[in-house]
Amino acid sequence: MVTCVPASEQVGCAERDSQVYCEDTGGTEAVRVTDCGSPEDSGPQDEPSYCNSEDSGQLMASYEGKARGYQVPPFGWRICLAHEFAEKRRPFQANNISLSNLVKHLGMGLRYLKWWYRKTHVEKKTPFIDMLNSLPLRQIYGCPLGGIGGGTITRGWRGQFCRWQLNPGMYQHQTVIADQFIVCLRRDGRTVYQQVLSLELPNVLRSWNWGLCGYFAFYHALYPRAWTVYQLPGQNVTLTCRQVTPILPHDYQDSSLPVGVFVWDVENEGDETLDVSITFSMRNGLGGEDDAAGSLWNEPFRLEQGGTTVQGLLLHHPTPPNPYTMAVAARCTADTTVTHTTAFDPNGTGQQVWQDLLQDGQLDSPAGQSTPTQKGEGIAGAVCVSSKLLPRSRCCLEFSLAWDMPKIMFGAKSQVHYRRYTRFFGSDGDVAPALSHYALCHYADWEDRISAWQNPVLDDRTLPAWYKSALFNELYFLADGGTVWLEVPADSLPEGLGGSMRQLRSTLQDYGRFGYLEGQEYRMYNTYDVHFYASFALVMLWPKLELSLQYDMALATLKEDLTRRRYLMSGVVAPVKRRNVIPHDIGDPDDEPWLRVNAYLIHDTADWKDLNLKFVLQIYRDYYLTGDQGFLEDMWPVCLAVMESEMKFDKDQDGLIENGGYADQTYDAWVTTGPSAYCGGLWLAAVAVMVQMAVLCGAQDVQERFASILCRGREAYERLLWNGRYYNYDSSSHPQSRSIMSDQCAGQWFLRACGLGEGDTEVFPTLHVVRALQTIFELNVQAFAGGAMGAVNGMHPHGVPDRSSVQSDEVWVGVVYGLAATMIQEGLTWEGFRTAEGCYRTVWERLGLAFQTPEAYCQQQVFRSLAYMRPLSIWAMQLALQQQQHKKSRRPSVTQGTGLSTQPECGPKRSLANLNSE
């Protein structure tokens, strides 16, 4: 019999209304977190100096246990499972728009409503941005499982499987109750403790013992790994579940695998021998419509290779258009026993499974496959690993979760695509056992490689603990951004495609095609104005994927789609895509991306001022960091073409482009008129980069032409926009023209990242750049929300946020990280960390938006666009820090390991053009 402690007698769990096992362990103490102090306490300094303690603050205040878990690292995002976030925000909606801004967007709103109705009710499709059905606040998410491009499954910090992206780019935010871990402890042949390791109290599977006491458990995330520590009160047992996903920089094989591993370290701190088992239950599908078609079935499997045996269950889910097989598996060792239950009803009481475990801590392991389900019927299975545990000892129980969806179709269902991992495992849909076996045999090597990559940052005592968490945990989006990584068959690239791009075919065929969404709510692949910020993570960690993406973007640039459509903001009818301009995005996963680009329907982005410039800047940055001369030569004609397209925006021939009097750049609801700090700065930076590329490509006439433009443009930029403290937002007569834009130095940011922007290659006067950054810090950061929420996009000189648009008074997390990188580049290191810290603490510690970092939030009440691409720009901070550590005469280059090495013997610095001479 199992001993149950009534809720009224439980320590720290008095409010719960079901039986759970939370006996007082006696002498428990709360986790103490050393106070590192505030940067304000010590004042500005040249280098940050922070202590290396746990940085969990209030997130661990509810923890009543004393267990620290087995080999849980000191750095990361740590939260007690009983924690409740006090602040409950809501997504941005129309009623959050001021009356003046509502009037400005009335036409757009009416056109959007008409388009939304046709899309949802006539076409039966989901809008690429659904402004009427934003994702609600759910403060539950943790590290996703799965490598890059094979789909992801997110496990929440309380242990729930709650966010699914198996169909490419399409998300289902649904907690599946049957997907659980169960622990069973036996002493002297009797089960003394059996508990679902979940805080849930569901109305299904009611025979199971739910309602784990969260006060004795905590979660710790350091992506791509996570740890959950459970102290089992009264049992002298601590469980540490380590979740491992193969996110491996510079690896283009294992990083693509759709797998995750759960390693359970069970510590027996008592004086009695224990029999312990962990059971992993999993539903076939997600329930509801996902199961409605029926014909789902499970079967056991056993695979022995190379002296290692893995066994478990296959959950076959043949529903079109993207059928898949899920595998729940465990490693068999001399010290463990693996058993299973092939099928049970996830909507029933669960009594059969529960009683089976109670009897002997194992499952009955029936042979053969289950009967296929009827329409609407659910099915689940479970795998159990058990072992004997001596007093004062530890055992290790290993599970894997793999899913095999080799062939995919996007929403248009017009083409079949093969995921990257099929190159290594095959595409017949029968490799889930092999994936499971591979994961369980290789995860230790993955962890060694992850540690070798992360440790230089984690061991750096000059870096604050919050930054170490942010840098790695924000990388979740590279896998969980609706990401696809596809094979590119040879016959899909016609001979004439790409013209003179000699490396295009080999790059795409060797490294595949990569796509990630602008955001989980903004469903467009490779949104380029945002990738400008996020791309630092990709080029530093998987540079070949960045180059592949750039080749795809170059191909799309050279094409046109003259299909005419009405744009929602202006109401103007214009083509989908014009030749020789960078597309906004590569397409919608609910359509046919790469075939039909520019899913973005709000503006005609052919007239945007930033896209072409961002392409040129990224091409040079990617060349600079990779040293790939062939890539630069391939992209040079495309850069010439897009810059030629950009020339028409310099209407007065003063060397500086003008914005068009509407929101014609990444701030797509913030009107810009005439020469502007943001687009003008990007323009000058792109022109400067064209001068450098012309030298490298031996195009002297082009070099002279752009050098002349740069000379005139620099003078116009300073004359029209510099006011002595910062660069004006734009040069119009509008009241907001003197706003302080936090992103005004974006051009300088990229120049510095490319080893330019100072000395002979100076474009913006260094004193002006530093003064502008100081002004931004004083007003956009320190004068906004007490300096604790990052930098507001726009601020009036008298210290009031610019509310002239719906975006000017927002904080954009990815922009703030880029701003912080710029500050670090210019020697304002303390200010940079202080600025970025406000965003991290707001998102991860205050708002409860871990692993769903939004594009934006306001000072109060709202956030916008959860799980967004742009915050990957935090890797620009890391690049700036690493570049700081290198001598001026050396060039950073992406290599195996942490991201950069110095190779002074090669690279573009051999032939830099002097930008300060005619």
From Swiss-Prot:
Reported regulation of activity: Enzymatic activity is dependent on membrane association and requires the presence of lipids. Inhibited by N-(adamantanemethyloxypentyl)-deoxynojirimycin/AMP-DNM. Inhibited by its product sphingosine/N-acylsphing-4-enine in a feedback loop. Also inhibited by other non-acetylated sphingoid bases and their derivatives but not by sphingosine-1-phosphate and complex sphingolipids.
Skewed-composition ranges (Polar residues): 892-904
Tissue: Widely expressed at low level. Highly expressed in testis and brain. Ubiquitously expressed in the brain (at protein level). Expressed by Sertoli cells (at protein level).
Natural source organism: Mus musculus (Mouse)
GO molecular function: beta-glucosidase activity; galactosylceramidase activity; glucosylceramidase activity; glucosyltransferase activity; steryl-beta-glucosidase activity
PANTHER family: BILE ACID BETA-GLUCOSIDASE-RELATED, NON-LYSOSOMAL GLUCOSYLCERAMIDASE
A single GO cellular-component term on record: endoplasmic reticulum membrane
Enzyme Commission identifier(s): 3.2.1.45, 2.4.1.-, 3.2.1.-, 3.2.1.46
Localisation: Endoplasmic reticulum membrane; Golgi apparatus membrane
Catalytic reaction(s) noted: a beta-D-glucosyl-(1<->1')-N-acylsphing-4-enine + H2O = an N-acylsphing-4-enine + D-glucose; a beta-D-galactosyl-(1<->1')-N-acylsphing-4-enine + H2O = an N-acylsphing-4-enine + D-galactose; beta-D-glucosyl-(1->3)-O-lithocholate + H2O = lithocholate + D-glucose; beta-D-glucosyl-(1->3)-O-chenodeoxycholate + H2O = chenodeoxycholate + D-glucose
Pathways involved: Lipid metabolism; sphingolipid metabolism; Steroid metabolism; cholesterol metabolism
Function: Non-lysosomal glucosylceramidase that catalyzes the hydrolysis of glucosylceramides/GlcCers (such as beta-D-glucosyl-(1<->1')-N-acylsphing-4-enine) to free glucose and ceramides (such as N-acylsphing-4-enine). GlcCers are membrane glycosphingolipids that have a wide intracellular distribution. They are the main precursors of more complex glycosphingolipids that play a role in cellular growth, differentiation, adhesion, signaling, cytoskeletal dynamics and membrane properties.
PTM annotation (Phosphoserine): residues: 893
SUPFAM superfamilies the UniProt entry points to: Six-hairpin glycosidases
Gene inactivation effect: Homozygous knockout mice display an accumulation of glucosylceramides in testis, brain and liver. The accumulation of glucosylceramides in Sertoli cells alters sperm shape and males exhibit impaired fertility. Despite the bile acid glucosidase and transferase activities measured in vitro, bile acid metabolism is normal in knockout mice. No obvious neurological symptoms, organomegaly or lifespan alteration are observed. Cholesterol metabolism and protein glycosylation are also normal in these mice.
InterPro entries in the record: 6-hairpin_glycosidase_sf (IPR008928), 6hp_glycosidase-like_sf (IPR012341), B_Glucosidase_GBA2-typ (IPR014551), GH116_catalytic (IPR006775), GH116_N (IPR024462), Non-lysos_glucosylceramidase (IPR052566)
Full protein name: Non-lysosomal glucosylceramidase
Keywords from the named record: Cholesterol metabolism, Endoplasmic reticulum, Glycosidase, Glycosyltransferase, Golgi apparatus, Hydrolase, Lipid metabolism, Membrane, Phosphoprotein, Sphingolipid metabolism, Steroid metabolism, Sterol metabolism, Transferase
Entry's pH dependence statement: Optimum pH is between 6.0 and 7.0.
UniProt membrane topology term: Peripheral membrane protein
Gene responsible for this protein: Gba2
Disulfide pairings: none
Example GO biological process: lipid glycosylation
